[in-house]
Design a protein with these regions (language model features):
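Donor-binding/catalytic cores of nucleotide-activated saccharide
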Residues: 72-203, 210-227
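Active-site acidic Asp-centered loop
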Residues: 18, 67-69, 94-96
Length: 266
């Protein structure tokens, strides 16, 4: 559980069990008893958006950071994000991330009999290990960030919540800054597009701070085409409104339309 091992120790760690009936809750309960920083919340299943919104309402810290259950943080992740936010008075800090596709052989793998650790041989065989980060390191204005976003409008880098640090007071001050509970796909991009409307100062990190494990059986891959099309059509209007608000719509019109047919780096 990497969040406990962060070099930044002034943490409140919220663990939200969204109705899981497996061993997740007992494990989380054990961790919460061992670490006073952990707040354990057990709730009926309501989906990722409602769960994140509950977590944001209950969080007491200055900043908000998100970690999905299947993924891991680098030990320095939170410290680096907070440090850059403080040093630059940033409303949002965005960082590069690693995408890892675990090795899963279709048939029994042939292992080297001369090497003793067979388990290690298997776990080290990764189909892909890629680092993604589209912005150069440094401070930028909202307009500069928005122009960068338009270069990769469908990317995980801009769309997800787990490679970013948000100001909690900015989220609390605006009731529309939340994950859409009506959407079942790209609800995190909806959150980011809404948050960007109120943020003014941005900072980008080129160091990868998050390890995203790309599981072919995850909700991202199992989303129905119709669901994805419906979500993209809805999000297109949010893109359009944001760039009209910034006075950047006309010069980015083609790139905004590109979002409808673009694919993510995953």
């Amino acid at each position: 559980f990497r969040s406990r091992r962060q070099t930044y120790e002034n943490l409140e760690i919220l663990l939200l069990n969204d109705g899981s009936k497996d061993v997740s809750y007992p494990v989380c309960e054990m961790l919460s008893k061992a670490d006073a920083r952990i707040v354990l919340i057990d709730k009926e299943n309501s989906g990722v958006s409602a769960t994140r919104n509950l977590g944001m309402r209950m969080a007491r810290g200055k900043y908000l950071q998100f970690v999905d259950a299947d993924d891991t943080l680098e030990p320095f992740a939170t410290e680096l994000l907070v440090q850059r936010a403080e040093d630059n008075n940033a409303d949002l800090v965005i960082a590069a991330y690693n995408r890892i596709v675990p090795y899963k052989p279709k048939k029994e793998a042939k292992l080297d009999p001369l090497l003793p650790n067979k388990k290690k041989q298997l776990t080290e065989r990764l189909a892909k290990f890629q680092t993604f980060g589209f912005l150069p390191m440094g401070f930028m204005t909202k307009e500069e960030f928005a122009c960068g976003l338009m270069q990769e409008p469908a990317s995980f880098y801009y769309g997800v919540m787990w490679n970013k640090l948000y100001r909690a007071d900015l989220v609390r001050a605006h009731t529309d800054v939340q994950c859409s509970e009506e959407m079942t796909w790209s609800e995190d991009l909806y959150f980011n597009l809404t948050y960007i409307r109120y943020a003014e100062r941005f900072f980008a990190l080129t160091a990868p701070i998050y390890n995203y494990y790309d599981n072919p059986g995850s909700a991202v891959h199992l989303t129905k085409v119709r669901t994805a099309i419906t979500a993209r059509t809805a999000l297109f209007s949010y893109y359009k409104e944001l760039y009209e608000q910034l006075g950047l719509y006309e010069e980015n019109k083609l790139q905004i339309f590109k979002y409808l047919i673009s694919s993510s780096e995953a």
